[in-house]
Amino acid sequence: MSKLFKAFLAAAAITLAIIGVVVGTREGMDIAQRTKYPIAYGGLITHYAGENDLDPFLVMAVIHVESNFIPEAQSHVAYGLMQLTYETAEWVANDMKVTYDYDIADPETSINFGCYYLRHLINIYENIDTALAAYNAGMGNVNSWLSDKQYSDDGVTLKVQNIPFPETRSYVEKVNASWEYYRTTDFADLDEDRGKIR
C-alpha cells in the first residue's frame, strides 16, 4: 500500500469518526430532549385542545409540568395527567353536563376535563399566565393577587416574578418554558400518537 493511499484511508477514517460523533451527539441530544420533554397522547391532546380552542402545545406543556405524561400521577389532592382535583372534575362534569361515570385518572377524561377547565380559566382571566396561575393556585388566590398592586399593575395581568407562592411562580415559568420547547419542535406524527411516550 502506498503512503498516499494510507494517508487517504487515515483521513477517511478520521472524517467518518467525526461524522459519527456529530450524528451520535445529535441523536444523543434528541434522546436527552425527549427524556426531558416527553410527549404522549398526541391524538387526544390535539382533539380536546381543538374542541376548546387551545394550542395543543400549551396543553402538552401543562401535562408535562403537572404529571410528566404519567397517567397514574397523583399529588395529595390531584390526579391524572392534568392533575385535577375531585372538586374541579365535579365542577367540569356538571358544567359539561356529563351524565356518565368518569375516572379523572383516565387519560382521555383527564385531557378532556383539563382542557375544558383551562379554557374556562383563559376565558375568565383573558391572560394565559394568569390562567396558569389559577390552574395551579386556584381562582381565589389569583383574584386576591390581581387586586393587589404588588402582584398586578392593572388588575388583569399578574407580574409572574412577583407571584407570592414560589410553587405557582415556578409552575407558570416551567409551563411557559415547556410550551416554548413543544411549539418550536417538529412533531410531524403528533395526531397519530395515542399514548406512547417518546
Predicted segment positions?
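Hydrophobic membrane-insertion alpha-helices, especially the h-region
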Residues: A7-T25
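Catalytic glycan-binding domains that act on GlcNAc-containing polysaccharides
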Residues: V23-R198
